Amino acid sequence: MEMDEDPDNLPAQGQGNIIITKYEQGHRAGAAVDLGHEQVDVRKYTNNLGIVHEMELPRVSALEVKQRRKESKRTNKWQKMLADWTKYRSTKKLSQRVCKVIPLAVRGRALSLLLDIDKIKSQNPGKYKVMKEKGKRSSRIIHCIQLDVSHTLQKHMMFIQRFGVKQQELCDILVAYSAYNPVSIPGQRYSWYLCPYSQAWVSLGGVATS
């Protein structure tokens, strides 16, 4: 069966198999859905949050420069705190800094420590892989997730490529979580997924392994 066939016109199990296969094969350079993005230097159109705009961005303003310097200082403070996590993990200072929003540059590491991901992963070896394979057998869930993934942060650098690496990871996370928590409804937007997949999986309430 050709992989370009419309999954909506196939039996349920066939739909699920084709969708999963497309994600496993990954992004195809020059695909119609994102050809426009590959023909330009997207760096000129991308802001500091990774969002790709329709028009080339103007030069950075004095206010933005000031904000970035402030963010850099906050990042340095977080790096020092993360380097001595045992000392700061239960302090008021940590709570205050979390409330001010964790800087993007250290957010992944901070979430990993806050959620105690390494401990949870070691206590549940293989759980994520088992749930992912189980979830792949549900065509209904896969089809719902596929619709959501294709609309998640379409203009963000991480998701701009159809069936790209980050779309693959997001699909895997949601497939696994749908198997782990069957009462969840995979019909919401998942724009929060901007951290490593194992952190996203644990933060959803599941358990992961690398």
Swiss-Prot record:
Residues 101-210 form the Rab-GAP TBC domain. InterPro entries: Rab-GAP-TBC_dom, Rab-GAP_TBC_sf, Rab_GAP_TBC_domain. It holds the Pfam family RabGAP-TBC. This is TBC1 domain family member 28. It comes from Homo sapiens.
